[in-house]
Amino acid sequence: YKHSSQLSINVKIIISSVRVLIDKLNINLKLKNGVIMSVGIIGLGAMGGAYARNLLAGGIAVHGFDPDLSAQKMLTEAGGTPQSDYGEWLRDCEMIILSIASTQILADSINKLCKILKPGQVVLETGTFTLDTKQAAKNDLDNCGAVLLDCPVSGTGAQAAVADLVMMASGPENSYLKIAPLLEHFTKKVIYAGPFGNGSKLKFVANHAVYVHNC
């Protein structure tokens, strides 16, 4: 019985790994064959706007929401599609990037996304917030079946403009691998740090090291 149980677990792991590989290959094939994929971005400021422009330059369709009219104009001029609010358009995105400035806006965004997203959709939270804030957002998305990855970035707005960012990604590895090829369009390097929250922990350590160095 013990052997049979272990065999069953191993088979499930293999099946899960194969599915992840297929998902990743599908994205790579779409990119290679010029199939237009869509990424949604919430927040089109200095960082989110840079993500959008670099993704568009890589042939990825970008839909974005930002209440700032100048941000909407920027996205239009870059070749993207600005949206007037959260909506069904988010359900067609391969991934959704959050580039948000405050905990309140993050909480509001997560609440709205929970009412729209399909099970299994991947959301990247790229800001620097407390672990408690990130965990609360993750719990809410878990409850509606979507997946949140903790993906803070290291770099300035100027570096973001030329895709010279380091991303510290954490969360379910299968979800990370599924969207990893898309990250190459707006980052220089992505470090997969393991379980959810490790990305932020790594970012905090990096920030502290910079602070100590500059003291």
Question: What is the predicted function of each stretch?
Answer:
Residues 41-44, 129-211:
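Rossmann-fold dinucleotide-binding core
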Residues 8-14, 20-21:
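Low-complexity, intrinsically disordered segments with a bias for serine/threonine
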Residues 86-148:
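Rossmann-fold NAD(P) dinucleotide-binding segment
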Residues 17, 23-36:
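Short, Lys/Arg-enriched N-terminal segments with co-localized hydrophobic residues
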Residues 1-6:
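Low-complexity, intrinsically disordered or signal/transmembrane-proximal segments
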Residues 32-98:
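NAD(P)+-binding Rossmann beta1-loop-alpha1 motif at the extreme N-terminus of oxidoreductases
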